[in-house]
């Protein structure tokens, strides 16, 4: 990491308004401009290496002689071992295991501005305002603020507005945002 001054910030990211006098630059940091493409490549590799994929709506999980049984609407699948990796949705499947797994939903806010990825060349975190902006293939992704809010509560429009206002404060005029969502 390197400490940078006001002019170095401008040299690195000229579209950020010149309101910061110092920052920290991580020259070896990396990010994915399209995480979905990476996941699809990994999935293709999984299939090429002999992995199998069934898209099913799992309704319940039980055990028979220590083996997990995944039940769908129409059939059951028995495995020697299984990993439940459904993120925030895992609790719905694990509730009937007889153990209280303390899992809640951490929801992160995202706002997407289309066709603005040229404004930044790397992710930038504005720690004093609690948000970050990352250039993606599809535009700029503005992220910040998290909450424990469950799976079913609607997103907070005031948090979305805060992200939009912060992004405009740092970068100036931006077009109307294209999308907003919660990441679980």
Predicted segment positions?
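Flexible hinge/switch segments at interdomain interfaces of large molecular machines
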Residues: 11-18
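Active-site substrate-recognition segment that forms the wall
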Residues: 63, 76-77, 81-184
